[in-house]
Amino acid sequence: MALTVDVAGPAPWGFRISGGRDFHTPIIVTKVTERGKAEAADLRPGDIIVAINGQSAENMLHAEAQSKIRQSASPLRLQLDRSQTASPGQTNGEGSLEVLATRFQGSLRTHRDSQSSQRSACFSPVSLSPRPCSPFSTPPPTSPVALSKEDMIGCSFQSLTHSPGLAAAHHLTYPGHPTSQQAGHSSPSDSAVRVLLHSPGRPSSPRFSSLDLEEDSEVFKMLQENRQGRAAPRQSSSFRLLQEALEAEERGGTPAFVPSSLSSQASLPTSRALATPPKLHTCEKCSVNISNQAVRIQEGRYRHPGCYTCADCGLNLKMRGHFWVGNELYCEKHARQRYSMPGTLNSRA
């Protein structure tokens, strides 16, 4: 439907456009501001702009059409082509991408809700008319033995693993009611879960007395994870060696050598690591073992750095050297006092 709209000015006009020759689409009104000038002139989203102020907009670029609309004098005359039914992708303030995203999210939410409802129905306690996917199914109506409503007990997988007081099976045994095996009938859910009922007078045990599960079933995997989680933690090799050494020491034996992973002896053989430490030198002046730095005077003769002094004045000879007079060490000054001739001095500078 062709029509002409006059929008009273001045700019801004209160609407947005999209398309153009560079987009290979006609120029279309995409949004109209509420209570604006364009809305007052009955401009609607989805209108195709055919001409702007009498100039054809068929070959206009998008920027060119925007410029002509912004710089137009009042009133702005637009020739429109309005369809009878609004396009589903053109709504006020909502582009086609937004509409599609909203619909896609809604469909995802609906699909997720349906899956959760199916999952809850599959794992929910047994109702009066159980679904075929439930492993806890009652005998078919054609079976000669059928349990009454009072004899039905619902039990989900969660109650099977976390509620030891509850016991469920594909056929439940009660006093006065023969089982399906006694009646000669078998159910296709024999391979699902079979749990023997606990005695009413006996307290419930955390472990089931009899449990047959398929290895690829979810309940079997859940029980395996719980059993592995309760297992004792493994000891490392170093901790085990340390524990054995402490136990040997408590028994009065010789503790085994446990090298640290950071020590230099960790990579050495055991015989070398347990070897006796090297022999320490003995100071010839104070007759004490030298545990750190030693001054070598002659072969087999050592002194502490503090004991390497003049026998007369006590001056340290480390930076000066020593002179032998008999069997004593002297500095040069006191050694010359004991000899009139310097040539007789025995210098060890």
UniProtKB/Swiss-Prot annotation:
Origin species: Mus musculus
GO CC annotations, alphabetized: cytoplasm; cytoskeleton
Modified residues (Phosphoserine): 124, 127, 129, 134, 137, 143, 163, 199, 204-205, 209-210, 263
The protein's name: PDZ and LIM domain protein 2
Predominant location category: cytoplasm
Residue ranges, compositional bias (Low complexity): 199-210
PANTHER family membership: PDZ AND LIM DOMAIN PROTEIN 2, PDZ AND LIM DOMAIN PROTEIN ZASP
Xref: SUPFAM superfamilies: Glucocorticoid receptor-like (DNA-binding domain) (SSF57716), PDZ domain-like (SSF50156)
UniProt cross-references to PROSITE patterns, sorted A to Z: LIM_DOMAIN_1, LIM_DOMAIN_2, PDZ
GO terms classed as biological process: protein catabolic process
Summary of the function given for this chain in its UniProt record: Probable adapter protein located at the actin cytoskeleton that promotes cell attachment. Necessary for the migratory capacity of epithelial cells. Overexpression enhances cell adhesion to collagen and fibronectin and suppresses anchorage independent growth. May contribute to tumor cell migratory capacity.
Subunit structure: Interacts with alpha-actinins ACTN1 and ACTN4, FLNA and MYH9. Interacts (via LIM zinc-binding domain) with MKRN2.
Ranges where the LIM zinc-binding domain occurs: 281-341
Disordered, as annotated region: 74-147, 169-212
